[in-house]
Amino acid sequence: MNSILSDLVKVIGMERDALLTYASYRLGNRSDAEDVLQDCYLRLHERFTDGQEGAKLNIRNYVFRSLSNLCTDRLADRTRHLTVDLGQQDVVETDTDNRESEYYRITSMLDRIPEEQAEVIRLRMYGNRSFAEISNILQVPLPTVKSRFLYGIEKIRKAMKPRA
């Protein structure tokens, strides 16, 4: 096993929960997140076993960036194949429903701000990434990452304030 592949295995082992949480918030459900995460692992494994190595590659950031790209692709596929469930029934709200309601509220707020800002917030809050790591993942300057986070949070706060 080459060194980059062994590094990939270590990163996947250490970051699995953070990657799954991040993908779950991007995609809206754990099942799709697990599928995308598995696809990401397989693609990266194939890439690195084919001898495509990068001497100065930061594996952790590369994995997050690859996962982010696959989530974006999955979301784009969803909008092309959007279906509507006409058989929904009203049910009594449970704790799971409360968590789902909170999830949809957060997702709705993130959908109202520019994608660049929402992506930084997701990586910071659900991916547990530092601003420096996010800068590397998104390949943008550190001050840009910080300003996107700040402006995104400010827009969310304004949206949450009750209107007088």
Residues of each region from the PLM?
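Residues within helix-turn-helix
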Residues: 31, 132, 143
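Internal acidic/polar
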Residues: 80-110
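Sigma70-family region 2
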Residues: 2, 39-58, 77-78
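Arg/Lys-rich amphipathic alpha helix in sigma70-family domain 2
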Residues: 64-84, 151
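A short, charge-rich alpha-helical start-of-domain segment used by transcription regulators
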Residues: 1-21, 25, 34, 118
